[in-house]
Amino acid sequence: MAGSADELVSLLDLETLEVDLYRGAQARTERQRVFGGQVAAQAVVAATRSVESRFVLHSLHSYFLRPGDTTVPIVYDVERIRDGRSFVTRRVSARQHGRPIYYMTANFQVPEPGLEHQDRMPEVPSPEQGMPLVELARSRGPEAAEHWEREWAALD
């Protein structure tokens, strides 16, 4: 779908209101509540903007507290918990109507070699070899495809 990537990029390009305070735009949607992945992604962007570029996201913990309102922008307040040489910690509060809808604690680390704590990824077909989601929706009928295009095309 033309413009979908641009729409996603603009959704993740938060407006800076003040130091460590950002406003996130809302996606065009027919849903009654904000998609949780949107809130989490915008919170990661807000936290990332408060750390030096040498740090990468290492871990995060999220708490979805209330449903988000799709008609109102979300304000992200970043709190700088810790600034170390190797690790940085941020807490992000996403707010609407003066109340928190989401909390996230994110840890960033300077990349370094270390122990591997997981198995290697098994050999699987590449994404290009899989069926595009829009085709899967079309296989379920024109209404499903139309709904998918409206709501999710920017994320595909």
Region locations from a protein language model:
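Terminal targeting signals and extreme-terminal segments of soluble enzymes
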Residues: 1-156
